[in-house]
Amino acid sequence: MPRDFSLDKVRNIGIMAHIDAGKTTTTERILFYTGKTHKLGEVHEGTATMDWMVQEQERGITITSAATTCYWKGHKINIIDTPGHVDFTVEVERSLRILDGAVAVFSAKEGVEPQSETVWRQADKYHVPRIAYVNKMDVIGADFFNVIDMIRERLGANPVAIQIPIGKEDTFRGIVDLIKMEAIIYKDDLGTVMDETEIPEDLKPLAEEYREKLLEAIAEVDETIMEKYLEGEEITEEEIHAALRKGTINGELVPVVCGSSYKNKGVQPLLDAIVNYLPSPLDLPPVKGMSIDGGEELERKPDDNEPFSALAFKIMADPYVGKLAFFRVYSGTLKAGSYVLNSTKGKKERIGRILRMHANHREEIDAVYTGDIAAAVGLKDTTTGDTLCDENHPILLESMDFPEPVISVAIEPKTKAAQEKMSIALSKLAEEDPTFKTYTDQETGQTIIAGMGELHLEIIVDRLRREFNVECNVGKPQVAYKETITKPVRVEGKFIRQSGGRGQYGHVWLEMEPAPRGEGYIFENRIVGGVIPKEFIPAVDAGIQEAMQNGVLGGYPVIDVKVALVDGSYHEVDSSDMAFKIAGSIAFREGMKKADPVLLEPIMKVEVVVPEEYMGDVIGDLNARRGKVEGMETRSGARVIRAFVPLAEMFGYATDLRSKTQGRGTYTMQFHHYEEVPKNIAEQILSAKK
């Protein structure tokens, strides 16, 4: 099968937003108008095409990023649906990594909310060009121009309106296109009958003012337009489109459109903007990677003739076909049934079938090309963030780094018989979601699940019940404490058994030192002259990592440590992987005790929005929770307090905040960093654990 669309006609986009800005409804409408769904799905009836996991339909929030392909005016658009709830920011990171452009959806009433800021900053990190869509123009309190100001002030972006609304709230009936300088009025409920007419008289002055602003903004990013603008010459529609496209792709401006997805108004012009201003894979620089030995930097151009390279960005357990691996192709082509190298794991994989996904129906295709997003069946060893590539031209694309879980609960099946079923289900879910971990507590023998927040774990328990028929009892949430060291040490680890029969001999010297916060574990091999043979080095590394699972203070995992293997010895006959693994483990535990270990706790970034009169109480309460207030500002009549608070102090905060503010306060929180627990509190935690 030859390529169906040339690469410049492909758009890989994500739709990002705060939890209630209307993102799923917007995606739904896009699928409706591009002819992919034949009945409109409503989120509050629980049938939206993208929200295909049952819990999402119940909660009305989008959790897993489903990838969907649709077509508009000769272009192929691959949409990655991203969740808007803070517990799922990892899903957002994961999808931003493989997008070329994004649509940021804002509610015309609330404007820029905390989660929209978080997602916006993540998109900045990956330099994702975007357009803004101001949705819900039909709701009471809608204010298009206020949202534009907020995008400028709160996000530090350069928003450029290319439309202005006609009417607002219940009189919202269309838009003024500032490029063509004409009005588009919607005539029917489905938004398929539109009148392109003259701009209403009362709106002409405003339209002229915003057309001027549009021309000024594009003159800033395009010199030829600047000259024409200063000379007072006519600037053509084509020139405006080209300058907006250039400015958007370079990240110099953000075109802003408006509408009401729920009322079916403004969606087709949004689709036009996606095609006109967001980049194709050709508009972006070649993707960078490393050679497998990490020695040289390589790149792959977006071209079908380059060697194949792709990134697996999502693994899903599918009830019909087993494990689905969603991947984005950066270069080359791939046929179903062929072999690829998973360069992250160093394993060959056979691509069974390749599926192009529509929210809940799938089409089997026999090949994928540069710029495509598809799902593969049959990959055994591939997990999220792995690189797939041509085995004759290996490359390692930059992987994604996922935050460690910050909250854990003990979980047990309601019947003993379901224990094994639960274990299998949990390992499947952990494979799908890199921020979800499951393990057995060594001391109590309980199964522990850990994730990014209470909602995250609730949804996991829910999926156990629905998808795997496992009913569970869940314990009280626990904070994921960690341990680390505070001073450098040099230690020896010996494991020698030589009494009769085959002996064991492993002997290592390690140098351990604290690593910067957030660095995790860094292992360095400094062995010279073969005092320990090369084949035993990975075993030492594995032994250290095993010992790191249980620290010496309270058995918590150890993080942020740099370990160098500097010396040791071996025995021709008795040395084995096992012996060196145990020696590495012994040395690490010994070193841990000597290196002044401390307890670390997760610190959350908390943002509380409250009416002015409750501010004193709320700040006092945050201080009592060991919080550090970082800053305050006023946002649409309410006060916003930003603080860093230990997670341990935040359990039950939702209820406390409601009662302190008579239900008028709201808050969001997400993990920010780990820091040392104050001595007196660390003592309490550790004595409770004993």
UniProtKB/Swiss-Prot annotation:
Function: Catalyzes the GTP-dependent ribosomal translocation step during translation elongation. During this step, the ribosome changes from the pre-translocational (PRE) to the post-translocational (POST) state as the newly formed A-site-bound peptidyl-tRNA and P-site-bound deacylated tRNA move to the P and E sites, respectively. Catalyzes the coordinated movement of the two tRNA molecules, the mRNA and conformational changes in the ribosome.
Segments traversing the membrane: none
GO biological process, one term: ribosome disassembly
Residue ranges of every copy of the tr-type G domain listed in the record: 8-282
Residues that bind GTP: 17-24, 81-85, 135-138
HAMAP family: EF_G_EF_2_B (MF_00054_B)
Keyword Protein biosynthesis: yes
Name of the gene: fusA
Main location: cytoplasm
GO cellular component, one term: cytoplasm
Coiled-coil region(s): none
Family: Belongs to the TRAFAC class translation factor GTPase superfamily. Classic translation factor GTPase family. EF-G/EF-2 subfamily.
Protein name (Swiss-Prot/TrEMBL): Elongation factor G
Alphabetical keyword list: Cytoplasm, Elongation factor, GTP-binding, Nucleotide-binding, Protein biosynthesis
InterPro entries documented for this protein: EFG_II, EFG_III, EFG_III/V, EFG_IV, EFG_V, EFG_V-like, EFTu-like_2, G_TR_CS
Location(s) in or outside the cell: Cytoplasm
